[in-house]
Amino acid sequence: MKLITALGAGKYEPVTYRWNDRTYETSFVQEAFVHWLKPEVTCVLLTEKARETHWNNLCQRLQEHTQIVEVDIPDGKSEAELWRIFEKISDAVCEGDQIAFDITHGFRSLPVIALLTIAYLKQIKQVKVRYILYGAFDAKDEQGTPVFDLTPFADLLDWLAAAKIFTATGDSSELGQLIQEIQNDAYRNREAYGENLPRALKNFGAALAEVSDDLLLARVPNLPKSVSNLIEKQKQASAEVSQWAPPLRLLLDKIATAYAPFQDDSLSTQAALIRWYFKHNHIMQAMTLAREWVVSYHLHKEGRDWRSRKEREQMEKRLGDSLQQDSLWSKIAEIRND
């Protein structure tokens, strides 16, 4: 693991830092984090003033426990300097790193820059953010100074991206992956959570992914079953969503509204699905289903079994032979072939 921390230039006082059931007394919160997290590498962001004031003291405390990397940064007094800090942090992180970010000290804009940098690095360098920690000196009480774990707030950026994809395209597979990862992470860190672990989130996430696959691959016959399964899994997971995945709570109604109409395979449902495909710009799926729907409609109109393969083949031949070139069938076939 790689710890990224900023050294401030202000006054440091000995305090007892408290994180869950762990405590550590020190003047430097970085020392507590190194003691708890045991990072192989610790990157310390240093302004010139911080180097002059505290660097030697901090270095002596850390050097026997972790490899120290000095990262000189400007004071952050201009937009150009803030971009320079962003670049410095990005350069300090390697492809695939697992990182912990300490935002206790430094300039006031550090938390914002940290979150944006993390979002960038997760996408570009595939880093894994293990922790974002803040030693809340202002919240000190008789038990010590609490350390807040702000990691879930960085995950908001992932939820934002997944929600945008769902809203724009109807694809909820990214949401499904995030939900499943929450349960996986909880079980990997079960010592911290005890017996209070999510048990329905993973099935809900898998059901979301299954519906998305059926929609995007136009597996229309599978949709009623997969959508009904999703609705059931959503009900089972609703309480856990509120506790473990708060960003998803606001989307639950939208998910149900988007997919619930596809719980049967009637012709009216398929017509609604064609409109859904067009609305979300899935033109190929829309035209493919529209062509099948025209066949189904004519068979249904004549009182024949529109699910029978033999009947469908015969109707397709009739439509192809008898309808005029400017007919709906012809237009759909032309667009589909394009």
Where are these regions (language model features)?
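Long, low-complexity, Lys/Arg-enriched
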Residues: 1-98, 119-338
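Elongated alpha-helical scaffolds
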Residues: 99-116, 331
